[in-house]
Amino acid sequence: MNSIEFPLLDQTTQNSVISTTLNDFSNWSRLSSLWPLLYGTSCCFIEFASLIGSRFDFDRYGLVPRSSPRQADLILTAGTVTMKMAPSLVRLYEQMPEPKYVIAMGACTITGGMFSTDSYSTVRGVDKLIPVDVYLPGCPPKPEAIIDAITKLRKKISREIYEDPISFQRENRCFTINHKFHVGYSTYTGNYGQEFFYQPPSTSEIASDTFF
């Protein structure tokens, strides 16, 4: 069920000896034991909760929900993310050990949804805060779509090449409280002071193409 193809795992001998690499073996062990951290804020989370029942039985994928980010390697954001919630979401992501993955579930998480038109406190896309691996559109998405997103993530993990965490290049992530985003570096110390919510400089000091 949901078999994943490995280029180097199909070379077997008559003595049942498997020829593979450490990288493929590590990917194989990780894709069948994803431990998600559920970050649900609205109706999308209810759809995910239905997977726990016997009808869908998401335990067959090796998913074990965790309540601590230090024990999780997958965070699933479901629902609206506001500016006040943004620092806690970034902190949870930074506390997760490498390698870690993100599934953005629902229109409100991906683009802000219906709240993005007239709300001043809604984040227009969680990818402004943390990198997203799989986008799952819908309002809300069905449980079958969630299973499909998890399957796509497992296929992505099976083809990964291990990267040294020290040399891993992180992208610039930032946010402000008034939706005038300015490119800057994330804070990885775990200490979130007033300097994290910096005052955006005037438009005369920044080129127009730096806003998004």
From Swiss-Prot:
Cofactor(s) recorded in Swiss-Prot or TrEMBL: [4Fe-4S] cluster
Topology versus the membrane: Peripheral membrane protein
Keywords annotated in UniProt: 4Fe-4S, Chloroplast, Iron, Iron-sulfur, Membrane, Metal-binding, NAD, NADP, Plastid, Plastoquinone, Quinone, Thylakoid, Translocase, Transport
Domain of life where this protein originates: Eukaryota
Binding residues annotated for [4Fe-4S] cluster, in chain numbering: C43, C44, C108, C139
Any one Gene Ontology cellular component term annotated for this protein: chloroplast thylakoid membrane
Compartments it resides in: Plastid, Chloroplast thylakoid membrane
Function of the protein: NDH shuttles electrons from NAD(P)H:plastoquinone, via FMN and iron-sulfur (Fe-S) centers, to quinones in the photosynthetic chain and possibly in a chloroplast respiratory chain. The immediate electron acceptor for the enzyme in this species is believed to be plastoquinone. Couples the redox reaction to proton translocation, and thus conserves the redox energy in a proton gradient.
Subunit structure: NDH is composed of at least 16 different subunits, 5 of which are encoded in the nucleus.
Name of the protein in question: NAD(P)H-quinone oxidoreductase subunit K, chloroplastic
Species annotation: Phaseolus vulgaris (Kidney bean)
